[in-house]
């Protein structure tokens, strides 16, 4: 893999990290997304972040959270309001990528969400995230999953 491609992947990974933090903050505070984004950009070194992708993830996940929740509810084993805030933010981001970014293989979406959960979540939350998003991928990307298996 070329250094340029590696840098692009790393920039997207960093965008996801900042986005999940912003989504979490929005869930807890309901502060306007533009304020969360502006403060994040001022307070952090963002020169190696895919800023366009960060902006898209943060704004679109928040704007579409009700629709994303509708996708998630059938594959959850508990009520939405019983989820940990980090888990919910990570699941919403993963659901958005599964639904709206078909160019990203579903396994990459799952792997990235698992890494976010390991970094920000509780001890075993990555296992829960994996299970939920795998079930969602079966619904949203059935053909891709069948082809991969």
Curated annotation (Swiss-Prot):
One of its GO terms (biological process) is transcription antitermination. The keyword Nuclease does not apply. InterPro entries: NusB-like_sf, NusB_fam, NusB_RsmB_TIM44. It comes from the Bacteria. GO terms for molecular function: RNA binding. HAMAP family: NusB. PANTHER family: ANTITERMINATION NUSB DOMAIN-CONTAINING PROTEIN, N UTILIZATION SUBSTANCE PROTEIN B-RELATED. This is Transcription antitermination protein NusB.
